[in-house]
């Protein structure tokens, strides 16, 4: 179990522009402040990931995404709420309320409310975070802290300890407007 002190340290680092690694439900994640352009571009460079692909935002609770939901139909909110917290990611219209370094070339953004205790505690302190699998492009996602260190030795500002959540696969991704599964979990 990771200490609250360590999570608070990670929160301070993120606010200062850090890129960190942390355990999630299925694999290790890389994260940073979605509003910090330099941090997001650094994360993308570490992964060799093109900015136009877009990124996932994770949160502690659905209220952290309220700024995106002002004009959403109530059934959309209910649909997301019924699956969160948990391994469900929803593609939702971003209505140009997020920067392009988060959304990429898409009219939607991927959102998830995590049920991993470390992620939830961290997001409760800093708000929504960028979350992407911890791996360089083309390599398998890190499932151990050792693999995180092998992939990114000395390139991350902090590696937040803790155990993975026990899921075998990443979250399912669905389109909120259609309900269509874009990526099986």
From Swiss-Prot:
Catalytic activity: L-threonine + hydrogencarbonate + ATP = L-threonylcarbamoyladenylate + diphosphate + H2O
Domain (YrdC-like) ranges: 4-185
Localization: Cytoplasm
Segments forming a coiled coil: none
GO CC terms of this entry: cytoplasm
Matches recorded under SUPFAM superfamilies: YrdC/RibB
Pfam families, per the entry: Sua5_yciO_yrdC
InterPro entries hit by this protein: DHBP_synth_RibB-like_a/b_dom, Sua5-like_dom, TC-AMP_synthase, TC-AMP_synthase_SUA5
Alphabetical keyword list: ATP-binding, Cytoplasm, Nucleotide-binding, Nucleotidyltransferase, Transferase, tRNA processing
Enzyme class: transferase
Molecular function via GO: ATP binding; double-stranded RNA binding; L-threonylcarbamoyladenylate synthase; tRNA binding
Biological process terms in GO annotation: regulation of translational fidelity; tRNA threonylcarbamoyladenosine modification
Principal localisation: cytoplasm
Entry's EC annotation: 2.7.7.87
PANTHER family documented for this protein: SUA5, THREONYLCARBAMOYL-AMP SYNTHASE
Family the entry assigns: Belongs to the SUA5 family. TsaC subfamily.
Functional note: Required for the formation of a threonylcarbamoyl group on adenosine at position 37 (t(6)A37) in tRNAs that read codons beginning with adenine. Catalyzes the conversion of L-threonine, HCO(3)(-)/CO(2) and ATP to give threonylcarbamoyl-AMP (TC-AMP) as the acyladenylate intermediate, with the release of diphosphate.
Protein's name according to its UniProt entry: Threonylcarbamoyl-AMP synthase
Species name: Pseudomonas putida (strain ATCC 47054 / DSM 6125 / CFBP 8728 / NCIMB 11950 / KT2440)
Gene that this polypeptide is encoded by: tsaC
């Amino acid at each position: 179990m990771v200490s609250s002190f360590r999570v608070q340290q990670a929160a301070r680092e993120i606010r200062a522009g850090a890129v960190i690694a942390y355990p999630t439900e299925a694999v290790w994640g890389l994260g940073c402040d979605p509003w910090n352009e330099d941090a997001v571009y650094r994360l993308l460079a570490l992964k060799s990931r093109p900015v136009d692909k877009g990124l996932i935002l994770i949160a502690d609770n659905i209220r952290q995404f309220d700024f995106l939901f002002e004009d959403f139909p109530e059934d959309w909110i209910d649909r997301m709420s019924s699956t969160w917290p948990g391994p469900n990611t929803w593609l939702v219209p971003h209505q140009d309320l997020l920067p392009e370094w988060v959304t990429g070339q898409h009219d939607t953004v991927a959102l998830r409310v995590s049920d991993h205790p470390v992620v939830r505690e961290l997001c409760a302190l800093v708000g929504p975070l960028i979350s992407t699998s911890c791996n360089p492009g083309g390599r398998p996602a890190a499932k151990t802290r050792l693999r995180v260190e092998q992939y990114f030795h000395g390139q991350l500002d902090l590696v937040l300890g803790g155990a993975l959540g026990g899921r075998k696969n990443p979250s399912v991704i669905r389109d909120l407007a259609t309900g269509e599964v874009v990526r099986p979990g």
